[in-house]
């Protein structure tokens, strides 16, 4: 059998490499960059397909190919390589858990300005490879805004360095952008250098509820806020379905997060109170309450490493990401609620009025879920946006096209893949168009 054969090859080829087998699958746990390089080189020469893992929280993104020959897990390739406190930069191994990194940096009053899903389990390599970001993307930006250098192990075993370890290091093409968000289809990120920010002095969360359901009020308020001098780090709209679960409020709600020195936060709170529509209900949440709220938000998306979610396949839970022009998020959230009210499905949705990114969770029967995916994707197209499926139960794999129409630049992506991974061994089917 291939599993037995590959297991024997790995133990002979790299006798000190940790190797495990389960469910007819070989998993290796490299602890050094050279081991990652040797494993990839061997797999490339022998055309063995590889799935790259960190904490496993994003293992469900894209459509993982279940016939990969080997899983390369970076959970034991961890640690801080270099932290320059004065320059506010840190270089870290890709398998380091995101929350572990933040706890270390907090000792120096610094942090990485990102808010990925499942921060307790996600690894920094997975966050960067998936370009993961959350509702605070409005103020924080994305991984592309935080990364200043990457070391990547190519499929043929070569180790390439792009960017550097200081903030001002750009000369020529910014190769970092090529790997951020590539879902491990071009190589394995081994080390990442990030620029840091100081830990915020004060944090506040304002919840605006709209019992009347008048989303034009929401839109008008958002325009006023975005046109003002205020700098919220999030402006996230939640439909009644998810508001009921997170806030015990079965109405449209708007979550505004503020982070700055305390005087600035209090000043912005006062301005928002003055701009607040008369029909809206305003609640200012304590700092600890704000942290607990966002923690719940970050764990609403499916966790690819959660066995309970895998076992609950019968629920047909599907996650979608929809991207539109920022204020069109109001229309997407409204449409999601209409679909939930009018069909035998439950649709929970939230989106950033400053970013245009919506996250949608759909539950129901197989037929209703498929129909809802199609409706939302088509609706996004009418807004010149897109809709992709982030998580899909195996029973729907043959029914739903997770990527939708290939973008006009798809030939460029395919050409890059062919050049960097000609044997197509890296994370098959994990990127646009099944790359």
Task: For every predicted segment, state its role.
Residues 1-41, 48, 55-88, 287-313, ...:
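N-terminal flexible segment immediately upstream of the FAD-binding catalytic core
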Residues 129, 148-306:
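C-terminal substrate-binding/cap subdomain adjacent to the FAD-binding core in PCMH-type
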Residues 55, 62-69, 75, 119, ...:
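Conserved glycine-rich FAD pyrophosphate-binding loop
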Residues 26, 249-259, 355-362:
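A generic structural motif
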Residues 1, 209-216, 262-263, 321-331, ...:
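Short, surface-exposed ligand-recognition loops at beta-strand->loop->(often short) alpha-helix junctions
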Residues 18-51, 68, 73-118, 132-165, ...:
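N-terminal glycine-rich flavin-associated loop
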Residues 49, 113, 231-236, 343-350, ...:
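A short linear hydrophobic-aromatic micro-motif
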């Amino acid at each position: 059998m291939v599993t037995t054969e590959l297991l024997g090859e790995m133990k002979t080829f790299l006798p000190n490499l940790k190797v495990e087998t389960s469910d007819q699958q070989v998993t290796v746990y490299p602890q050094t960059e050279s081991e990652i390089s040797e494993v990839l080189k061997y797999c490339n020469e022998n055309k063995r397909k590889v799935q790259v893992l960190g904490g496993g929280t994003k293992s469900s993104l894209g459509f993982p190919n279940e016939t990969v020959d080997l899983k390369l897990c970076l959970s034991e390739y961890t640690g801080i390589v270099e932290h320059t406190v004065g320059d506010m930069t840190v270089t870290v191994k890709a398998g380091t858990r995101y929350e572990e990194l933040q706890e270390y940096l907090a000792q120096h009053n610094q942090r990485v300005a990102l808010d990925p899903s499942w921060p307790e389990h996600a690894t920094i390599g997975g966050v960067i490879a998936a370009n993961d970001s959350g509702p605070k993307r409005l103020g924080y930006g994305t991984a592309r805004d935080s990364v200043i250098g990457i070391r990547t192990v190519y499929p043929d075993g070569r180790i390439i360095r792009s960017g550097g370890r200081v903030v001002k290091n750009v000369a020529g093409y910014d190769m970092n952008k090529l790997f951020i968000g590539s879902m491990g289809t071009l190589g394995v990120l081994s080390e990442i250098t990030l620029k840091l920010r100081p830990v915020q002095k004060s944090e506040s969360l304002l919840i605006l509820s709209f019992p009347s359901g008048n989303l034009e009020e929401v839109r008008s308020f958002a325009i006023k806020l975005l046109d003002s001098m205020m700098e919220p780090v999030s402006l996230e709209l939640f439909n009644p379905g998810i508001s009921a679960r997170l806030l015990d409020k079965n109405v449209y709600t708007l979550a505004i997060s503020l982070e700055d020195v305390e005087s600035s936060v209090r000043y912005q709170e006062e301005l928002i109170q003055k701009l607040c529509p008369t029909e809206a209900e305003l609640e200012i949440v304590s700092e600890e309450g704000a942290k607990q709220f966002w923690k719940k938000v970050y764990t609403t998306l499916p966790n690819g490493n959660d066995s309970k979610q895998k076992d609950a396949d019968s629920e047909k839970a599907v996650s979608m990401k929809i991207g539109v022009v920022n204020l069109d998020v109001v229309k997407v959230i409204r449409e999601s609620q209409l679909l939930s009210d009018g069909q035998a499905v439950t649709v929970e949705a939230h989106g950033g009025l400053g970013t245009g990114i919506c996250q949608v969770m759909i539950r129901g029967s197989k037929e209703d879920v498929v129909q809802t995916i199609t409706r939302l994707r088509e609706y996004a197209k009418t807004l010149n946006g897109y809709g992709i499926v982030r998580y899909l139960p195996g029973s729907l794999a043959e029914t739903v096209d997770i990527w939708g129409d290939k973008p006009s630049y798809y030939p460029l992506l395919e050409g890059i893949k062919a050049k960097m991974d000609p044997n197509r061994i890296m994370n098959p089917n994990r990127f646009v168009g099944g790359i």
